[in-house]
């Protein structure tokens, strides 16, 4: 989801982050096996293999096809810099392929909506309403299970695939555009200095001063994975997760003023002083801090379960060439680290979410170079210090306990 930054004194966050992180190996995640595509055609000199359509095209043919497609629809999150992102992509296509295209960039904090629409279109024999989905990894895994995901890797239109570590790829069906995203708690370190663990949200001093995620999607899911770890519960067992929900509702519930994942609401409540803490994505702490709210701090869970964004192309996408162009652009170092875009530092910190591989390390901007590793892990830490999630198990059981959570809070 929409990611933003954590905030503590320089150099202290990195130490806190990784002192608490559970070292359990690389971020390879358990996920359903992708269905194989047809054998790739053999292209001659001067041609590029274009996946999804499985055709060979010259550069001129690619340009003509992009002009013919004319645009694409991407399902993502609610970045504050979405308008700039749209403009930058459209300018890139014009400069690279000579075509004027329209990027429709949809945003939501409830990405399950995308799968619902894709499944309905597939069942009805209709074209997919999206050309690219760019949300958390668990939705890709669910999409594969439902038969909604196209094979598209490798493709000559996506040379930037080679820049991304294997642990962030599920070829042939998806590739990460984030490496360090996870749900956490953003809090005011002056008003709530006692917050050290997720269980500390039960402190009576926070009565009426926090928000928790609304049930149903990965923001709530990620929060409860972290809380389950603190309570010694197994997130793969729905009965144990219901116990985690019961604990949260009983102990944290009296402090909750609202259950929501609406980002503008969360930020308005926090910035006005109406709340002292909210459960949302780690990047929001960065956004608050760089926006001038220097007391905004990230509570890092003792066990970090990453929920990174992954790019994939739905079956039935009607603009498959532009979909691949967008994915390649999104993976480029210049977009992963949008240093030349006309955006504020807080917006930059939303769009950039860690290194995908060694070729990205040199792109940290000068204005952030001295403090970058106070807010982000090193590439080696990214490779080794996050706990992978069994998304098959999560997807198989989460609806049961998420529905239970909804019932317990009256939603």
What are these regions (language model features)?
Residues 140-142, 271, 277-294:
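A ligand-binding cleft/hinge motif common to bilobed small-molecule-binding domains
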Residues 41-137:
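Early extracytoplasmic/lumenal segment of secretory-pathway proteins
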Residues 43, 376-411:
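Conserved C-terminal helix/tail region of periplasmic/extracytoplasmic solute-binding proteins
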Residues 313-382:
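Mature extracytoplasmic/periplasmic domains
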Residues 184-191, 228-230, 307-322, 338-342:
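A bilobed periplasmic-binding-protein/Venus flytrap-type ligand-binding module shared by bacterial periplasmic
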Residues 72-87, 106-115, 127-274:
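Extracytoplasmic ligand-binding site segments that recognize negatively charged/polar headgroups
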Residues 162, 167, 180-181, 245-251, ...:
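Periplasmic-binding protein-like
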Residues 27-36:
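Bacterial lipoprotein signal-peptidase II cleavage site
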């Amino acid at each position: 989801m929409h990611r933003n930054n954590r905030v503590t004194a320089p150099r202290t966050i990195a130490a806190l982050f990784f002192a608490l992180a559970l070292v359990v190996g690389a971020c390879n995640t358990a996920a359903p096996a992708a269905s194989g595509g047809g054998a790739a055609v053999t292209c001659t000199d001067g041609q590029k293999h274009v996946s999804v359509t499985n055709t060979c095209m010259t550069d001129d043919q690619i340009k003509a096809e992009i002009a013919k497609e004319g645009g694409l629809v991407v399902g993502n999150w609610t970045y504050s810099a979405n308008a700039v992102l749209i403009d930058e992509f459209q300018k890139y296509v014009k400069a690279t392929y000579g075509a004027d295209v329209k990027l429709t960039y949809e945003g939501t904090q409830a990405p399950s909506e995308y799968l619902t629409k894709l499944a309905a279109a597939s069942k009805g024999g209709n074209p997919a309403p999206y050309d690219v989905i760019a949300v958390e990894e668990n939705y890709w895994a669910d999409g594969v299970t439902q038969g909604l995901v196209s094979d598209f890797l490798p493709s000559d239109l996506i040379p930037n695939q080679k820049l991304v570590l294997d642990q962030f790829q599920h070829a042939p069906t998806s590739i990460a555009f984030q490496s360090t995203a996870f749900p956490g708690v953003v809090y005011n370190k002056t008003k709530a200095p006692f917050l050290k663990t997720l269980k500390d949200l039960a402190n009576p001093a926070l009565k009426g001063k926090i928000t928790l995620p609304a049930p149903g999607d990965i923001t709530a899911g990620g929060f409860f994975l972290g809380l389950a770890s603190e309570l010694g519960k197994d997130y793969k067992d729905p009965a144990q997760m219901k116990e985690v929900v019961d604990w949260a509702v009983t102990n944290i519930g009296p402090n909750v003023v609202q259950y929501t994942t609406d980002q503008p609401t969360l930020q308005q409540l926090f910035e006005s002083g109406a709340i002292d803490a909210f459960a949302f994505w780690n990047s929001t702490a960065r956004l608050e801090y760089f926006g001038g709210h220097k007391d905004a701090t990230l509570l890092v869970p003792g066990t970090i379960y990453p929920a990174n964004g992954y790019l994939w192309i739905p079956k039935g996408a009607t603009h498959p060439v532009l979909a691949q162009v967008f994915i390649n652009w999104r993976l480029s170092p210049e977009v992963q680290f949008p240093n030349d875009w006309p955006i504020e530092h807080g917006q930059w910190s939303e769009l950039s979410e860690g290194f995908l591989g060694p070729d990205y390390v040199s792109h940290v901007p000068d204005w952030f170079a001295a403090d970058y590793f106070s807010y982000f892990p090193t590439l080696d830490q990214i490779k080794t210090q996050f706990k992978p999630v069994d998304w098959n198990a999560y997807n198989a059981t989460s609806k049961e306990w998420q529905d239970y959570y909804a019932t317990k809070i009256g939603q």
